[in-house]
Amino acid sequence: MWLQTRMFLLVAVLFGILYGVITGIGTWMGAGSAISYLILAFVFLGIQYLIGPSIVTWTMRVRWVSEREAPELHRMVAELAEKANLPKPKVGISELNIPNAFAFGRTQRDGRVCVTRGIMNLLSRDELRSVLGHELSHIKHRDMAIITLLSAIPMILYWLAWSMMWGGAFGNRRQGGSYAVLIGLGAFLLYFITNLLVLYGSRIREYYADQGSVRLGCKPHHLASALYKLVYGNARFRDKGELKQVEGARAFFLNDPARAWYEVKEL
Protein backbone atom coordinates (compact mmCIF):
# COMPACT_ATOMS: atom_id res chain seq x y z
CA MET A 1 0.00 0.00 0.00
CA TRP A 2 2.81 2.42 0.93
CA LEU A 3 4.58 1.63 -2.37
CA GLN A 4 1.41 2.53 -4.30
CA THR A 5 1.02 5.76 -2.33
CA ARG A 6 4.63 6.78 -3.00
CA MET A 7 4.26 6.04 -6.71
CA PHE A 8 1.02 8.04 -6.91
CA LEU A 9 2.63 11.01 -5.15
CA LEU A 10 5.68 10.81 -7.42
CA VAL A 11 3.56 10.87 -10.60
CA ALA A 12 1.54 13.79 -9.20
CA VAL A 13 4.73 15.75 -8.40
CA LEU A 14 6.32 15.12 -11.82
CA PHE A 15 3.26 16.14 -13.80
CA GLY A 16 2.68 19.04 -11.40
CA ILE A 17 6.19 20.33 -12.15
CA LEU A 18 5.62 20.03 -15.91
CA TYR A 19 2.23 21.74 -15.63
CA GLY A 20 3.73 24.53 -13.53
CA VAL A 21 6.54 25.23 -16.02
CA ILE A 22 4.20 25.27 -19.02
CA THR A 23 1.71 27.46 -17.13
CA GLY A 24 4.54 29.86 -16.27
CA ILE A 25 5.51 30.07 -19.93
CA GLY A 26 1.87 30.67 -20.83
CA THR A 27 1.57 33.47 -18.26
CA TRP A 28 4.66 35.24 -19.59
CA MET A 29 4.38 34.56 -23.32
CA GLY A 30 0.65 34.06 -23.80
CA ALA A 31 -1.60 31.01 -23.97
CA GLY A 32 -0.74 30.35 -27.62
CA SER A 33 2.93 29.77 -26.83
CA ALA A 34 2.06 27.54 -23.88
CA ILE A 35 -0.20 25.42 -26.10
CA SER A 36 2.62 25.17 -28.67
CA TYR A 37 4.97 23.89 -25.98
CA LEU A 38 2.32 21.46 -24.75
CA ILE A 39 1.80 20.08 -28.26
CA LEU A 40 5.55 19.71 -28.73
CA ALA A 41 5.75 17.95 -25.36
CA PHE A 42 3.22 15.34 -26.51
CA VAL A 43 5.06 14.98 -29.82
CA PHE A 44 8.29 14.25 -27.91
CA LEU A 45 6.43 11.74 -25.76
CA GLY A 46 4.99 9.99 -28.83
CA ILE A 47 8.38 9.81 -30.54
CA GLN A 48 10.02 8.41 -27.41
CA TYR A 49 7.25 5.80 -27.09
CA LEU A 50 7.68 4.70 -30.72
CA ILE A 51 11.46 4.60 -31.03
CA GLY A 52 12.36 3.93 -27.38
CA PRO A 53 12.78 0.13 -27.75
CA SER A 54 15.06 0.57 -30.77
CA ILE A 55 17.20 3.09 -28.89
CA VAL A 56 17.54 0.75 -25.88
CA THR A 57 18.44 -2.17 -28.19
CA TRP A 58 21.15 -0.13 -29.90
CA THR A 59 22.50 1.55 -26.75
CA MET A 60 22.70 -1.69 -24.78
CA ARG A 61 24.19 -3.68 -27.70
CA VAL A 62 21.42 -6.27 -27.50
CA ARG A 63 21.51 -9.34 -29.73
CA TRP A 64 18.28 -11.32 -29.95
CA VAL A 65 19.02 -15.01 -29.51
CA SER A 66 17.17 -18.08 -30.75
CA GLU A 67 16.28 -21.15 -28.69
CA ARG A 68 19.16 -23.00 -30.35
CA GLU A 69 21.65 -20.36 -29.21
CA ALA A 70 20.40 -20.07 -25.61
CA PRO A 71 18.08 -23.02 -24.84
CA GLU A 72 18.26 -22.74 -21.03
CA LEU A 73 17.60 -19.00 -21.07
CA HIS A 74 14.60 -19.47 -23.37
CA ARG A 75 13.29 -22.34 -21.23
CA MET A 76 13.35 -20.28 -18.03
CA VAL A 77 11.70 -17.28 -19.71
CA ALA A 78 8.98 -19.48 -21.25
CA GLU A 79 8.19 -21.16 -17.90
CA LEU A 80 7.99 -17.86 -16.05
CA ALA A 81 5.93 -16.19 -18.79
CA GLU A 82 3.41 -19.04 -18.63
CA LYS A 83 3.10 -18.65 -14.84
CA ALA A 84 2.62 -14.91 -15.25
CA ASN A 85 -0.02 -15.40 -17.99
CA LEU A 86 2.10 -13.40 -20.41
CA PRO A 87 3.04 -13.95 -24.05
CA LYS A 88 6.62 -15.14 -24.16
CA PRO A 89 8.81 -12.04 -24.58
CA LYS A 90 11.74 -11.74 -26.95
CA VAL A 91 14.96 -12.94 -25.35
CA GLY A 92 18.21 -11.09 -25.84
CA ILE A 93 21.78 -11.01 -24.62
CA SER A 94 23.49 -7.65 -24.17
CA GLU A 95 27.13 -7.81 -25.19
CA LEU A 96 28.15 -5.82 -22.13
CA ASN A 97 30.32 -7.13 -19.32
CA ILE A 98 28.63 -5.09 -16.63
CA PRO A 99 26.46 -7.55 -14.65
CA ASN A 100 22.81 -6.56 -15.02
CA ALA A 101 19.43 -7.39 -16.53
CA PHE A 102 16.57 -5.32 -17.90
CA ALA A 103 13.18 -5.53 -19.58
CA PHE A 104 11.54 -3.08 -21.97
CA GLY A 105 8.85 -2.80 -24.61
CA ARG A 106 5.71 -0.81 -25.36
CA THR A 107 3.13 -3.39 -24.25
CA GLN A 108 2.93 -6.85 -22.69
CA ARG A 109 2.83 -8.37 -26.20
CA ASP A 110 5.89 -6.33 -27.17
CA GLY A 111 7.90 -7.35 -24.10
CA ARG A 112 11.66 -7.97 -24.31
CA VAL A 113 13.89 -9.46 -21.63
CA CYS A 114 17.66 -9.12 -21.75
CA VAL A 115 20.61 -10.22 -19.66
CA THR A 116 24.19 -9.05 -20.02
CA ARG A 117 27.18 -11.30 -20.54
CA GLY A 118 28.41 -10.16 -17.16
CA ILE A 119 25.37 -11.43 -15.26
CA MET A 120 25.40 -14.79 -17.05
CA ASN A 121 28.97 -15.36 -15.88
CA LEU A 122 28.18 -14.29 -12.32
CA LEU A 123 24.92 -15.95 -11.19
CA SER A 124 23.84 -19.54 -10.63
CA ARG A 125 20.87 -20.97 -12.54
CA ASP A 126 18.43 -20.41 -9.66
CA GLU A 127 19.67 -16.87 -9.12
CA LEU A 128 19.36 -16.08 -12.82
CA ARG A 129 15.84 -17.54 -12.83
CA SER A 130 14.83 -15.26 -9.95
CA VAL A 131 16.24 -12.28 -11.85
CA LEU A 132 14.27 -13.25 -14.96
CA GLY A 133 11.15 -13.54 -12.79
CA HIS A 134 11.85 -10.02 -11.58
CA GLU A 135 12.14 -8.74 -15.15
CA LEU A 136 8.95 -10.48 -16.32
CA SER A 137 7.15 -8.87 -13.40
CA HIS A 138 8.15 -5.51 -14.87
CA ILE A 139 6.41 -6.49 -18.10
CA LYS A 140 3.38 -7.81 -16.21
CA HIS A 141 3.02 -4.53 -14.29
CA ARG A 142 3.62 -2.46 -17.48
CA ASP A 143 6.50 -0.74 -15.71
CA MET A 144 8.34 0.05 -18.92
CA ALA A 145 5.43 2.09 -20.25
CA ILE A 146 5.22 3.93 -16.91
CA ILE A 147 8.96 4.69 -16.78
CA THR A 148 8.98 5.70 -20.47
CA LEU A 149 6.14 8.12 -19.77
CA LEU A 150 7.81 9.56 -16.68
CA SER A 151 11.27 9.80 -18.27
CA ALA A 152 9.81 11.98 -21.02
CA ILE A 153 9.21 14.75 -18.45
CA PRO A 154 12.94 15.50 -17.78
CA MET A 155 13.54 15.38 -21.53
CA ILE A 156 10.75 17.93 -22.12
CA LEU A 157 12.10 20.20 -19.38
CA TYR A 158 15.60 20.01 -20.87
CA TRP A 159 14.22 21.06 -24.26
CA LEU A 160 12.27 23.92 -22.65
CA ALA A 161 15.41 25.08 -20.82
CA TRP A 162 17.46 24.96 -24.00
CA SER A 163 14.77 26.80 -25.97
CA MET A 164 14.45 29.56 -23.40
CA MET A 165 18.15 30.07 -22.70
CA TRP A 166 19.64 29.66 -26.18
CA GLY A 167 16.76 29.53 -28.63
CA GLY A 168 15.46 33.04 -28.16
CA ALA A 169 12.11 31.83 -26.79
CA PHE A 170 10.50 31.87 -30.25
CA GLY A 171 11.61 35.40 -30.98
CA ASN A 172 10.57 37.07 -27.70
CA ARG A 173 14.06 37.34 -26.29
CA ARG A 174 14.48 41.03 -27.20
CA GLN A 175 11.20 41.90 -25.45
CA GLY A 176 12.08 40.05 -22.24
CA GLY A 177 15.33 38.19 -22.59
CA SER A 178 16.12 38.22 -18.88
CA TYR A 179 12.80 36.55 -18.10
CA ALA A 180 13.46 33.92 -20.74
CA VAL A 181 16.85 33.15 -19.19
CA LEU A 182 15.33 32.93 -15.70
CA ILE A 183 12.62 30.54 -16.89
CA GLY A 184 15.29 28.56 -18.75
CA LEU A 185 17.48 28.29 -15.65
CA GLY A 186 14.47 27.22 -13.60
CA ALA A 187 13.55 24.57 -16.18
CA PHE A 188 17.16 23.36 -16.24
CA LEU A 189 17.20 22.98 -12.45
CA LEU A 190 13.89 21.12 -12.59
CA TYR A 191 15.36 18.88 -15.31
CA PHE A 192 17.95 17.59 -12.81
CA ILE A 193 15.37 17.26 -10.03
CA THR A 194 12.90 15.34 -12.21
CA ASN A 195 15.71 13.07 -13.44
CA LEU A 196 16.34 12.07 -9.82
CA LEU A 197 12.60 11.62 -9.25
CA VAL A 198 12.31 9.32 -12.27
CA LEU A 199 15.19 7.21 -10.93
CA TYR A 200 13.39 7.09 -7.58
CA GLY A 201 10.23 5.96 -9.39
CA SER A 202 12.25 3.26 -11.09
CA ARG A 203 13.47 2.02 -7.69
CA ILE A 204 9.86 1.86 -6.43
CA ARG A 205 8.93 -0.29 -9.43
CA GLU A 206 11.89 -2.52 -8.56
CA TYR A 207 10.29 -3.33 -5.21
CA TYR A 208 7.09 -4.32 -7.01
CA ALA A 209 9.10 -6.56 -9.32
CA ASP A 210 10.86 -8.22 -6.36
CA GLN A 211 7.45 -9.18 -4.98
CA GLY A 212 6.38 -10.37 -8.43
CA SER A 213 9.41 -12.65 -8.77
CA VAL A 214 8.46 -14.43 -5.53
CA ARG A 215 4.84 -14.77 -6.69
CA LEU A 216 6.12 -16.56 -9.80
CA GLY A 217 7.67 -19.23 -7.60
CA CYS A 218 11.22 -17.94 -7.35
CA LYS A 219 12.82 -18.35 -3.94
CA PRO A 220 13.38 -15.09 -2.02
CA HIS A 221 16.88 -16.16 -0.92
CA HIS A 222 17.89 -16.80 -4.54
CA LEU A 223 16.78 -13.28 -5.49
CA ALA A 224 18.53 -11.85 -2.43
CA SER A 225 21.81 -13.61 -3.23
CA ALA A 226 21.53 -12.51 -6.88
CA LEU A 227 21.07 -8.87 -5.84
CA TYR A 228 23.97 -9.19 -3.39
CA LYS A 229 26.27 -10.45 -6.16
CA LEU A 230 25.06 -7.75 -8.56
CA VAL A 231 25.75 -4.96 -6.08
CA TYR A 232 29.33 -6.15 -5.55
CA GLY A 233 29.77 -6.95 -9.24
CA ASN A 234 28.74 -3.43 -10.24
CA ALA A 235 30.86 -1.85 -7.49
CA ARG A 236 33.96 -3.69 -8.76
CA PHE A 237 33.29 -2.91 -12.41
CA ARG A 238 35.98 -0.60 -13.79
CA ASP A 239 35.21 -0.14 -17.50
CA LYS A 240 34.38 3.58 -17.58
CA GLY A 241 33.48 3.38 -21.27
CA GLU A 242 30.71 0.85 -20.62
CA LEU A 243 29.51 2.74 -17.55
CA LYS A 244 29.21 5.91 -19.60
CA GLN A 245 27.44 4.01 -22.38
CA VAL A 246 24.70 2.77 -20.06
CA GLU A 247 24.27 6.07 -18.18
CA GLY A 248 21.03 6.91 -20.00
CA ALA A 249 19.55 3.45 -19.38
CA ARG A 250 20.01 3.33 -15.60
CA ALA A 251 16.26 3.51 -14.98
CA PHE A 252 15.80 0.18 -16.81
CA PHE A 253 18.41 -1.75 -14.82
CA LEU A 254 17.75 -4.27 -12.06
CA ASN A 255 20.63 -2.70 -10.13
CA ASP A 256 21.83 0.89 -10.59
CA PRO A 257 25.60 0.83 -11.34
CA ALA A 258 25.96 4.46 -10.23
CA ARG A 259 24.76 3.62 -6.72
CA ALA A 260 26.64 0.33 -6.30
CA TRP A 261 29.34 1.71 -3.97
CA TYR A 262 26.75 3.35 -1.72
CA GLU A 263 24.79 0.10 -1.56
CA VAL A 264 27.95 -1.84 -0.67
CA LYS A 265 28.47 0.48 2.30
CA GLU A 266 24.89 -0.17 3.41
CA LEU A 267 25.30 -3.96 3.29
For each predicted feature, which ranges?
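Short alpha-helix carrying the canonical HExxH Zn2+-binding catalytic motif
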Residues: 114, 124-140, 145
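Juxtamembrane helix-boundary/capping and inter-helix hinge elements in multi-pass membrane proteins
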Residues: 65, 108-109, 122, 126
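Hydrophobic or amphipathic, alpha-helical segments that drive membrane association/targeting
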Residues: 1-102, 151-203, 207, 217, ...
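Active-site-proximal gating segments in proteases and membrane effectors
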Residues: 86-110, 174-175, 214-267
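A secondary-structure boundary/capping signal
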Residues: 94, 115-119, 135
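Catalytic Zn2+-binding segment of zinc metalloproteases
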Residues: 136-155, 164, 220-221
